[in-house]
């Protein structure tokens, strides 16, 4: 019986020791703000693993917002941290230079103490994680009527003399407006290669007849 009690006490002591060790190595986070760079200390990772990072000295805004942030958070418990930061940044900008001066003096004093305590300190900002690029292409927006007219006039610069050619041109505009923008350039290039020799030798009426008989193909 005594052996069981001793085993339980030993297990409880180990758990308590682990909790205390976790509390000592837990991360400390300084809240970010819109006008200055805050220093953030996390548990060791990468090159800082196993090393104690030195806190960056506070600037004037951090000294001022240290108490203001707590005050705003108590008055507005539902407000998110990002909204509090925006409000504090706006209030800081509205202060006059005379109102800001005591906080600048306090920041200079803290920086002097920091230099004496950590003479070899160098600020090393953390690199921001790059957003992952998606392989999926966004659908292209449909071109305007003016762009479609320019494309038609560029690839088919013939004169419309009869109703047949005008109908062919109208049919081409309808297909350009209803087709997907990605397939427009490919179809026009195929037609340009197919009718390049015909447009130089034949008459506009002959070209219009070919166009109406063989409409462009638009893959779905």
From Swiss-Prot:
<dbReference type="GO" id="GO:0030154">
    <property type="term" value="P:cell differentiation"/>
</dbReference>
<feature type="region of interest" description="Disordered">
    <location>
        <begin position="193"/>
        <end position="220"/>
    </location>
</feature>
<dbReference type="GO" id="GO:0005737">
    <property type="term" value="C:cytoplasm"/>
</dbReference>
<dbReference type="InterPro" id="IPR050140">
    <property type="entry name" value="SRY-related_HMG-box_TF-like"/>
</dbReference>
<keyword id="KW-0112">Calmodulin-binding</keyword>
<dbReference type="GO" id="GO:0005634">
    <property type="term" value="C:nucleus"/>
</dbReference>
<keyword id="KW-0804">Transcription</keyword>
<keyword id="KW-0010">Activator</keyword>
<dbReference type="Pfam" id="PF00505">
    <property type="entry name" value="HMG_box"/>
</dbReference>
<feature type="DNA-binding region" description="HMG box">
    <location>
        <begin position="54"/>
        <end position="122"/>
    </location>
</feature>
<dbReference type="InterPro" id="IPR036910">
    <property type="entry name" value="HMG_box_dom_sf"/>
</dbReference>
<keyword id="KW-0221">Differentiation</keyword>
<dbReference type="InterPro" id="IPR017253">
    <property type="entry name" value="SRY"/>
</dbReference>
<keyword id="KW-0963">Cytoplasm</keyword>
<keyword id="KW-0726">Sexual differentiation</keyword>
<dbReference type="GO" id="GO:0005516">
    <property type="term" value="F:calmodulin binding"/>
</dbReference>
<dbReference type="GO" id="GO:0000978">
    <property type="term" value="F:RNA polymerase II cis-regulatory region sequence-specific DNA binding"/>
</dbReference>
<keyword id="KW-0805">Transcription regulation</keyword>
<dbReference type="GO" id="GO:0001228">
    <property type="term" value="F:DNA-binding transcription activator activity, RNA polymerase II-specific"/>
</dbReference>
<comment type="function">
    <text>Transcriptional regulator that controls a genetic switch in male development. It is necessary and sufficient for initiating male sex determination by directing the development of supporting cell precursors (pre-Sertoli cells) as Sertoli rather than granulosa cells. Involved in different aspects of gene regulation including promoter activation or repression. Binds to the DNA consensus sequence 5'-[AT]AACAA[AT]-3'. SRY HMG box recognizes DNA by partial intercalation in the minor groove and promotes DNA bending. Also involved in pre-mRNA splicing.</text>
</comment>
<protein>
    <recommendedName>
        <fullName>Sex-determining region Y protein</fullName>
    </recommendedName>
</protein>
<dbReference type="InterPro" id="IPR009071">
    <property type="entry name" value="HMG_box_dom"/>
</dbReference>
<dbReference type="GO" id="GO:0016607">
    <property type="term" value="C:nuclear speck"/>
</dbReference>
<dbReference type="GO" id="GO:0007548">
    <property type="term" value="P:sex differentiation"/>
</dbReference>
<keyword id="KW-0539">Nucleus</keyword>
<comment type="similarity">
    <text>Belongs to the SRY family.</text>
</comment>
<dbReference type="GO" id="GO:0030238">
    <property type="term" value="P:male sex determination"/>
</dbReference>
<keyword id="KW-0238">DNA-binding</keyword>
<comment type="subunit">
    <text>Interacts with CALM, EP300, HDAC3, KPNB1, ZNF208 isoform KRAB-O, PARP1, SLC9A3R2 and WT1. The interaction with EP300 modulates its DNA-binding activity. The interaction with KPNB1 is sensitive to dissociation by Ran in the GTP-bound form. Interaction with PARP1 impaired its DNA-binding activity.</text>
</comment>
């Amino acid at each position: 019986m005594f052996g069981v009690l001793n085993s339980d006490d030993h297990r409880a002591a180990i758990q308590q020791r682990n909790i205390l060790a976790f509390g000592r190595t837990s991360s400390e986070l300084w809240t970010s703000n819109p006008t200055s760079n805050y220093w953030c200390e996390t548990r060791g990772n990468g090159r800082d693993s196993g090393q104690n990072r030195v806190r960056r000295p506070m600037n004037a805004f951090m000294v001022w917002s240290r108490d203001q942030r707590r005050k705003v958070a108590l008055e507005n418990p539902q407000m998110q941290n990002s909204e509090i930061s925006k409000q504090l940044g706006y209030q800081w900008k509205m202060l006059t230079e005379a109102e800001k001066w005591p906080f600048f003096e306090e920041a200079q004093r803290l920086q002097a103490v920091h230099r004496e305590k950590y003479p070899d300190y160098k600020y090393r900002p953390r690199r921001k994680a790059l957003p992952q690029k998606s392989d999926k292409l966004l659908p292209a927006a449909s071109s305007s009527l003016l762009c479609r007219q320019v494309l038609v006039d560029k690839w088919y610069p013939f004169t419309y003399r009869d109703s047949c050619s005008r109908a062919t041109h109208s049919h081409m505009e309808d297909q350009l407006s209803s087709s997907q923008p990605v397939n427009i350039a490919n179809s026009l290039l195929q037609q340009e290669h197919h009718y390049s020799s015909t447009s130089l030798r034949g008459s506009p009426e002959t070209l219009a007849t070919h166009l109406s008989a063989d409409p462009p193909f638009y893959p779905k």
